[in-house]
Amino acid sequence: MASYATLLEKTRVPQPSIQRFAVISVFSKLRSAPEQFGSEAEAGREAISFCLTSESITVVDQSVHELCRLVSDSVLDLSRGLLELQSALEGCDSKLVSLFVKGLGFLIRIGYERNNGNWKFNSTENHPFVRIQSSRVETQTELLHQVSLFVMHNRRLGMVGVCEFLEPFLNFTILRIPLSDSSSSLFARELISSMASLCCSSRHEALPIFRLLMRCLKYIPGNNLEVIVKILVDAYTVVVRDLVGTGLEVTEVHLLGVQLVDGVLFLCASPHVQTTEQESVIESLKHLLAVQKDLGLAYSHDLSLVVLSLVFMLAKSTVEHEQLCILKFLLFLLKWKTESENLSVKDAAGSSVESLLLFPITALMSSPSKSIKVAASKVLSIVENFLVTVSNAPKIEVHTSKGDSPLSRVGSVVFRFMQQLWHQNDYTPSTSSFLRVAYTNGSEKQETYLGPVTWNSLLREHAERFWDKKKLSASFCLSQEIPILLGAVAGVMVMHPSLGADAIGSLTIIGGIDSKMSVPLLLAVLYFSNLLSRTNVPCQSLLSKLLGLLPSLAAQQVMIPLVVQTITPMLRKDAKGLLYATAIRLLCQTWVVNDRAFSSLQEVLRPQGFIEYISERHICISMAASIHDVCKRHPDRGVDLILSVQACIESQNCPVRALGFQSLSHLCEADVIDFYTAWDVIKKHAQHIKLDPLLAYSVCHLLKWGAMDAEAYPEDAENVLNILWEIGSSMQKPHDSQWTKARVSAIVALGQYEVSFMENKFSDFNKNCTYLLFSETNAEILNALEDLSIKIMIHEHSVRRRYVREKKVPGSKIEKLLDVIPQVIFPAGKEIKTGELPGAALLCLSYNPRDVKFGSSRSFHDVHFQYEEAFRVVVKSLQLSRNISLALISLQSLKAFMRRWMRANILSIDATTKELSSDKTSKATNNIMKSLVHMAEEALPRCAENIALALGALCAALPAASHNIKASASKFLLSWLLEHEHEHRQWTAGISLGLISSSLHVTDHKQKFQNISGLLEVLCSSKSTLVKGACGVGLGFSCQDLLTRTEASASSDIDSDSYRNQEERLLGRIVRLLSSILHGFLHTPCDILESLSALFPPGEEDNVIGLPQLLDESSDDFDDDTWGIAGLIIGLGMSVGAIYRAGKKDAVVKIKNLIVSWIPYADSLKQTSGSNSKVSVRLFSVGSCLALPIVITFCQKVELFDAHEVDDIIGCFKDLISELLIVRKSGALRKRLLMASCIGAGDLLGSVLNEGIHPVKIESVKELLELFKKCYSGLYPPVAHFGGMLGVVNVLGAGAGNLVYSHPRPRAPPASSEENEISYVSGPLLSNAYFTQQLTPVVQEIFLIAQNTKDRQLQHYAAWAISILRTYMRSGESSSLSNENQSDDSDRNSISHNVPEHTMVMKLAQGLTNPSFPLAGSPLNIGTMASALRCLSHAPRLPNLDWGATIRRLMKQETQTDVTQSGDVPKEITLREECFKFSLAHASEFDELLAFLDELSELSRFKALEESLQSCLLCHLGGLMRIFSGSRMNKLFDDVSCFVVSLSSDQTYSCDQKSSLRVSCWKGLSQCLEETSLESSEYVTKIEKCIELLFAVLPVASQSPRADQMGSVKEWSEAVTCLQKSHRDWLYKFLQVSNLEPGNEKTNFQGDLKKIQAKAKLAKLGSVPFSELGKLKAIILNCEESDIWDVLIEIVAALHHAEGGIKRQWLIDAVEISCVSSHPSTAIIFVGLLSSICCEYMPFLNLDRSTVLSDMSVTVTSLLSDPSYEVVTEPFISFLWTSLERVYSFATESDANARLSSQQIAQSERDKAPMLVKVMHYICVAFRDHLPLEKQLRLASMDMS
């Protein structure tokens, strides 16, 4: 600095000229000095600083000039110059401030020029103008001048660039206002005024400056907005006048003015803006538009947004002069619009935002200000035209332009919502609404909302919730504008052609939301009444509905006079009749709302009115209806009108009389009038009620109240009952709805009287009621009769006699004969050896240890020895004759013998030791097993055959859990089966081995597979036809246990799928081999056998050795061929059950048809390829006769057998047996065929009769019995005699030789049964009184033959046959191995179900069980039968009838085409479903019903049911759980699991049917969870497994309002209900979600989404705490929004019902997560969703992905302005700002930079980022006061263009 010292010293000289020269010299030296002494050197810098910091103004002034010259000449760097001047400015004296500001201004202009108008700064604080302003307050005056100079000097470079340069400075100036003193505010105003002045001076370059100022408006504090707007408007006025005058930029300046008005109103009409005086702002904006209009500019459609903002401001305003100002503005806009010459009808409709003004303007008509009323009326007259235009052009799609801003405003949201409501009938909505989400998604009222939901219903729910909150917190209230805006929407919708009525209902709801709306609503009613009365309005029909709104307004006490005053003019005597009648009804409804109106109503309803207006039908009816309402709602008030009631009853007008009777009925119901006293007075007016259905209905409604005092007035009560019965039973009346209603009323009235009283007054009351029910076809009447019948049944049960338990006495001669058979055949005193009657001995001999003493083991050995010796004798003498039929009968007999042997052993062990039941059974069975094996080792061939059968019988009689015994027996029999050299061992061992396989335990897979594999091996390899046939029978037995269990039955070491696959492969081998072998024996083509083989493709293990040549009939071995083929056919027939379970129903039908075709003389019934061969028929006929009953029995159970087939097949058997009996030609085949046909015919007929499905002709039964009698009494071989006897026994149900199906013991026929002439019989013959008498001689004859010792062989067969029948009849008494806890079921049935004949239960039961019951009529229709079943389902007890057969017949009956169907029966109610429900109700009492349910719920049978019955069964899983055993329930749950899994891929069901079935399954599982306790862990595990499988196929819940989503809604509803009842620990574990990764194969993304949705729904219902849902926040909000949209909605719906603290925490957490999430849009959208559903504007918001973000400008700002959310506003805005910076950086940087700097934001967010930034920026600006200034400046610096 030394080199400059001299010159610097001269600056101190107090001489200005010397000082200036010194400064010039210093800077000249700096300019020319070498580098070490230049301006950049330390000496140079010090010299400059010295000059600038001088106290002399002259020095400083010259120094600033010289410094600027250095910079201008590029000697000094610009930044250095700015720095020097800025530093000097900050430390200078205030009088020097202007010098430095001028210098800085000059340098700034130079810098801008050098950068060609593109001078940018990295932060607002570094902006030179900002630095100047920030330095000190004194700079403001000169700074304004420099800014103006800057603009004027640099405008040549482009005004747009100049404005961009100044924008940060302008924003800084505005943002500093709230943080500094008033001078900042003043400076800001002056700055804006200065720039506005520049616009005036540079009119052609003014538009960019205007846009700059408009962009800054959003940062201006509200109290400064008024002045700023006035400045801008004034400047705009100058500019627009000039530009329009010159014709330049007219369009741009026009649009700019509209944008200015819109932008200012957008700020004023924002939800977060507090209500302030905005009158001057509105006036300024109006002035701007007035200038445009004066200049001839056209009305812009963009002004529709201005109107929307004014609508909101008008609704929100409470200040009169502000309201008046807005009205004037609106009036100006509307006039301008209507004056536009180019406004067409379509344009008016397209811009019909004005229609929203209707209700707010109408509301202002109640203002006390005359000026407001005048202005409002003017606006209303113009709006009316728009409204009429819209109503006449409803299909013109309405839309509004949103201009440049995509952000929503309250007005646009309301208008958009109104548009969608208006067009919802013309366009399918693609969006839902938040109201729907809040109140119909999993709420307690969800069932109500399944299907289309109207805004009206949702708004009503919203209003109810509002009042609930109001009750909890008195301070809770809605903003003033909400009900007004709701009214604005409803007011427009009133004019809708089809939705007007709903809109009027909405107005009623709005009145309930805010009591202050009553007067506006009254005015709206008056206005619309006037409007709708005009001819040019197409909605005149709504007038009455609109007037109906008046009474609802009377809820407010102050409104009563106004409402009554409004109605009163319509009650003038000169008023029109219809108007007068309407007024009466309105007055009545007003009284309903408020009792203060009663005096006015009573005056109108005086009795004289009926005389005065006798010719005015409408008025009389209106008066009567009002009297009726009063009596119904307030009986005490009704007493005051009793004379008017009497006047109604005395009227000649039937409707008036009817209403009078109904009014009196309500008074009697309330007991304010005595019924019989009143009846004495008015009964003369009820004499002709049968002429008018309405009158009959009303009188019956009255007469039911006579029940209370009927005993006190018996004569009058009897007359009343006669009237009711006459009307209720009058079936001759026309079948119209009115008479139906009358009859129902009469029957319901009868139900009010005591049953005992009616029985005393009516003879045969029960019989008449039953006849009426069975004769009726109308569904409504049937329902009423059901209730009456149920009441009668309950009464009968309550007064029933207590029957004394008596010793059971055989009820018929047949039973007496059967009881004495053992004593007669094996008398104690005679030496009749067991060996002579071996068959009977097996069934009759019994040795009981009568002398057993405790601790004695001798008795056990004695009894065991007795049985062993008897068995030795039997096996030696019982000849099977290589006859498979005899073998099966012997096996059946041996099973009964083994059961008695075991029981005797167990009883003996009981007396000697105290062991467990299972141990006793095992010990007893081991002893028998040892004896049998010991005997078998050295047995002769005949004995060996029987011993092999005995082993099978022993195992079949054992419990399934006896593993060891069955395994040992199987091993022993397998060894015999594989001894090909011992044929006598092989064939019976094969049969027994199959029988054992069918009775193995569920876990004995290995043993079962070994047994079947052995049978298949021998079937393929044996050269003996008999052995092949026996193996076929054994395989048929084995099939009974194939595919009967699902995966839950698989053991732990065998995979469930592989286990079932093994069984399916085994079944395939069995059917394929049997079909192939039969086809080989047939030697002729057979399409069915070939198709059966094709259904089960061959495997590598099948290798059938060449079939032996069939021998001639005369050959000795011909029997082997006959019975061998018969065995194969029987085996094939036995396999139908397994084939059906495998899902091959068609194969079952083919087998049935094939076997039928092999019966001789059956060709006319079924034609099958290959059946014409005589050889085939002869050889295959024996087996087909024996196999057919098995196949038909199964087909009956699964409904594959039609009624018309019964008579045809029975006819075939009759023809066959008749021919065999007539032709006495001897021959082995005829002998065997005669035996087989008799056995088969008897078994078939017995099966059909016992099932009870198909009635059989009486003559057919008689003819068959006669043929059987001829067979066993004629000169035929003994085996033929045996066949005839077995035919008789089988007809009675014994099922001789049929080990697959057994029939329940027949019930004794009713003691008082009448012998009526009948042509058909259904049910067991021994349960039929007629046939019991017919059969007694037949049984006696066989009984006598069994006593005849002349022919030992015939005696043997007769004794055996009669013993089989005896065993069958005693089957209920000996079904258990031990007598522990054994109850006598027969006694229970005969006593506990002993129901008198005259009772209602018995009459109904007879009508259903007996098709020929006289009361039933002919024929019964489905509706009648279903009603009878419903009645009996409620019966406390049922008579002891054959209910199993009845239910099966009814199940089949509905599917028959000849059954009449009542047209009134609802389609969703089916007879088959009622059969199921009836069975479920009484299955615990009747085993046959339990068996029916067991069959129906078998998986294969269940799959074949119709969808409605499947749904019914699934819905009642809980009921089945109450009656099924534990093991059966396990299997049922496994079957349900399999069905659920297979349902998804089943193509036979439609999507709706699948959904319906899943819904039913959810309902059923819910029932099961209710029935299941915590201790039932096994059931719970099974149920939870079903729930998991159902949940896996549950569709992801969607909020789409489409109709195809209704199934999903129902599924979710039931699923959530079910999950609510599940155990908490399992539920939390099941719904646990660790992460969400779409596309990751290791995770089930869709399943996880459903779990989250389920958890949200459960949280909404309170079943799961919100803390559980909160654990998933981070996981959910870090996913892409498109993947989890529905999940977000579900969570928001749940949070809507949460406490406020939970909502606020979710709001904060969501926006915080957006700061780090890779998908920030998801979190922000969630914030938008949550804000939408929680804010006040929720009723107007649509749930649409495209609008949720844009609506956040309304929803979030509204929510954060709520006082309850103010506590979280600051942290929310802080996190939102952080997220905004992150997303803004991502959106504005290049892809490469964004990947590095934006913290892992996914690239998929790039398209959403601009909108995200815009929304977040708006919210941050709106709540900028919660941010520090530096963040506000960065906020303002963000480029939002």
From Swiss-Prot:
Record note on disruption phenotype: Shrunken non viable seeds due to arrested embryo development when homozygous. Alteration in cuticular waxes with elevated amounts of cutin monomers in leaves. Susceptibility to the obligate biotrophic fungus E.cichoracearum and increased resistance to the necrotrophic fungi B.cinerea and A.brassicicola.
Region (Disordered): 1374-1393
Keywords: Cell membrane, Cytoplasm, Lipid metabolism, Membrane, Plant defense, Transmembrane, Transmembrane helix
UniProt name for this protein: Protein RST1
Tissue and organ distribution: Expressed in the vasculature of leaves, petioles and hypocotyls, anthers of mature flowers and siliques. Expressed at low levels in roots and stems.
Subcellular location as annotated: Cell membrane; Cytoplasm, Cytosol
Membrane-crossing residue ranges in chain numbering: 250-270, 296-316, 347-367, 479-499, 513-533, 546-566, 943-963, 982-1002, 1123-1143, 1175-1195, 1229-1249, 1277-1297, 1719-1739
Assembly and binders: Interacts with CER16/RIPR.
SUPFAM superfamilies membership: ARM repeat
Topology in the lipid bilayer: Multi-pass membrane protein
Source lineage: Eukaryota, Viridiplantae, Streptophyta, Embryophyta, Tracheophyta
Pfam family, one: DUF3730
Any one GO CC term of the record: cytoplasm
Tree of life domain: Eukaryota
GO biological process: alkane biosynthetic process; cuticle hydrocarbon biosynthetic process; defense response; embryo development ending in seed dormancy; lipid metabolic process; negative regulation of post-transcriptional gene silencing by regulatory ncRNA; seed development
Reported function: Involved in cuticular wax formation. Required for the synthesis of alkanes from wax precursors. May play a role in acyl-CoA reduction to aldehydes. Is repressed by FREE1 and functions downstream of FREE1 to negatively regulate multivesicular body (MVB) biogenesis and vacuolar transport. Together with CER16/RIPR, acts as a cofactor of the cytoplasmic exosome and connects the cytosolic RNA exosome to the SKI complex. Acts as a post-transcriptional gene silencing (PTGS) suppressor.
InterPro entries per the UniProt record, alphabetical: ARM-type_fold (IPR016024), FOCAD/RST1_DUF3730 (IPR022542), Focadhesin/RST1 (IPR045163)
Species whose genome carries this gene: Arabidopsis thaliana
